[in-house]
């Protein structure tokens, strides 16, 4: 697609040699788009836009393509006609017109000016419908999949409440293998041949009785 766009000249790569606008009358030509000028309305006010394109091989001849509501639509019409009349030698207003605009049939170019004008109008209308169409079902499905992936890491509030610290409070029997704290440390001290700590020194009402008391003396 990039190679296809690079094969065409655009108004951005080859700007006009002279400033847009007539010298004897007020400026009506579009400052950027090729083949587009304003029709009616004061400069800066809302108006309609007309488009015309030069006919190859006929010096001074121009093909009238019609009147359009926006300058962009008129510029697209110019590109469609230029592609039909000049092929890869066309200078486009938009680089993507080479692949986004519906092609004008070769039979239309052979039918003369009216055939080209009618085919260009059909191409511009089809392009506008395509641009205004909603996203395809495949894109919608992909977006839904992304939302599901994002929601996987979100923990519901109801589930989070289950992990309250109080719900997992363990008693001494579970901590010390079915024994109370005193019996557990007495058994441990006997295995290590050391004096066990004083009974009741470890837990009192579920909390440490004294944080500065040594575990046991050697």
From Swiss-Prot:
- Give yes or no: UniProt keyword rRNA-binding: no
This protein's major location comes to: nucleus
Q: Which SUPFAM superfamilies match?
A: DNA-binding domain
What do we know about what induces or represses this protein's expression? By cold stress.
GO cellular component terms given for this protein: nucleus
Transcription as a keyword of this entry, yes or no, is yes
Q: Which InterPro entries match?
A: AP2/ERF_dom (IPR001471), AP2/ERF_dom_sf (IPR036955), DNA-bd_dom_sf (IPR016177), DRE1A-I (IPR045277)
UniProt keyword list? Activator, DNA-binding, Nucleus, Stress response, Transcription, Transcription regulation
According to the record, the segments passing through the membrane are none
The UniProt annotation gives the DNA-binding region as: 32-95
Family indicated by similarity: Belongs to the AP2/ERF transcription factor family. ERF subfamily.
What's its job? Transcriptional activator that binds specifically to the DNA sequence 5'-[AG]CCGAC-3'. Binding to the C-repeat/DRE element mediates high salinity- and dehydration-inducible transcription. Confers resistance to high salt, cold and drought stress.
This protein is called what?
Dehydration-responsive element-binding protein 1B
């Amino acid at each position: 697609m990039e190679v296809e766009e690079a094969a065409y000249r655009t108004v951005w790569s080859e700007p006009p040699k002279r400033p847009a606008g007539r010298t004897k009358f007020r400026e009506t030509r579009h400052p950027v788009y090729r083949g587009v000028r304003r029709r009616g309305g004061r400069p800066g006010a809302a108006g309609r836009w007309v488009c015309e394109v030069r006919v190859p091989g006929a010096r001074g001849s121009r093909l009238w393509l019609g009147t359009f509501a926006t300058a962009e639509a008129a510029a697209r019409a110019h590109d469609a006609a230029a592609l039909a009349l000049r092929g890869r030698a066309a200078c486009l207003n938009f680089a993507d017109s080479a692949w986004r605009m519906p092609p004008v049939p070769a039979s239309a170019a052979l039918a003369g000016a009216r055939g080209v004008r009618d085919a260009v109008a059909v191409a511009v209308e089809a392009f506008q419908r395509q641009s205004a169409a909603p996203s395809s079902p495949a894109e919608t499905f992909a977006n839904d999949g992304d939302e599901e992936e994002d929601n996987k890491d979100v923990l519901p509030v109801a589930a989070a409440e289950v992990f309250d610290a109080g719900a997992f409070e363990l008693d001494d029997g579970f901590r010390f293998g079915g024994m109370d704290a005193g019996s557990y440390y007495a058994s441990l001290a006997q295995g290590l041949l050391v004096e066990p700590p004083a009974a009741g020194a470890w837990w009192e009402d579920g909390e440490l009785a004294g944080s500065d008391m040594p575990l046991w003396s050697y």
